[in-house]
Amino acid sequence: MSHSGSVLRRNGFTFKQFFVAHDRCAMKVGTDGILLGAWAPVADVKRILDIGTGSGLLALMLAQRTDDNVPVDAVELDAEAAMQAQENVAHSPWAHRITVHTDDIQRWAPRQTVRFDLIISNPPYYEPGVECATPQREQARYTATLDHQTLLAIAADCITEDGFLCVVLPEQIGNAFTQQALSMGWHLRLRTDVAENEARLPHRVLLAFSPQAGECFSDRLVIRGPDQHYSESYTALTQAFYLFM
């Protein structure tokens, strides 16, 4: 199924192979999520866990990138967002292998009897303090419902020995997250610093951690070139998804 020849729909984001409605989700489809979903390593992946799936964006992107026998579990605490994710999945080509769970990951994870070789999350990163317009948006953006130490501990209990935990965070918060992860026994294996253009400092960082030690590969990604069009590297990373690339 492809939406490439269809009329663009409102209240969501149209990709080449699927549509993500997000009008009932606190966090909308954005560059952070698209970067993470396109970047996460999927070679030899057999089972995927998406923590805090929101609209289902990451689950859908990873389903597109993996073999048809790879199950994806997507966990979302907010009932309204989870319902929208379920609808997005149902209208996608991968409804048979993506399961959306309306639950708190801290309750859901201990009940699982299988481990995941890819765990992915676009996690909250603001400390509580500044009020949000809605409780749902606060939940999606603030670490009060899932702090980074808890996320790392849950992932450690759910991951295979050679699996990857992948996140996207603002640069400075990503550095603190890395220190927290290293102190808990994780190993940083992949890091991509993301800048808007060559003249700017990185503002986001893509991180992949593993329980297994190994060499860490680091690089830099620039989103836009001098002409303000998407750079060759960003296009190469995301062109399987963006409708007009």
Curated annotation (Swiss-Prot):
Pfam families, per database record: MTS
One Gene Ontology molecular-function label: tRNA (adenine-N6)-methyltransferase activity
EC number(s) stated in the UniProt entry for this protein: 2.1.1.223
Gene3D superfamilies: Vaccinia Virus protein VP39
Keyword Methyltransferase listed: yes
Any Gene Ontology CC annotation: cytoplasm
Reaction catalysis annotation: adenosine(37) in tRNA1(Val) + S-adenosyl-L-methionine = N(6)-methyladenosine(37) in tRNA1(Val) + S-adenosyl-L-homocysteine + H(+)
One example of a Gene Ontology biological process annotation: tRNA processing
Keyword line: Cytoplasm, Methyltransferase, S-adenosyl-L-methionine, Transferase, tRNA processing
The keyword Transmembrane helix is annotated on this UniProt entry: no
Compartmental location: Cytoplasm
Residue ranges of the TM segments: none
Family: Belongs to the methyltransferase superfamily. tRNA (adenine-N(6)-)-methyltransferase family.
Function: Specifically methylates the adenine in position 37 of tRNA(1)(Val) (anticodon cmo5UAC).
Protein name per its UniProtKB record: tRNA1(Val) (adenine(37)-N6)-methyltransferase
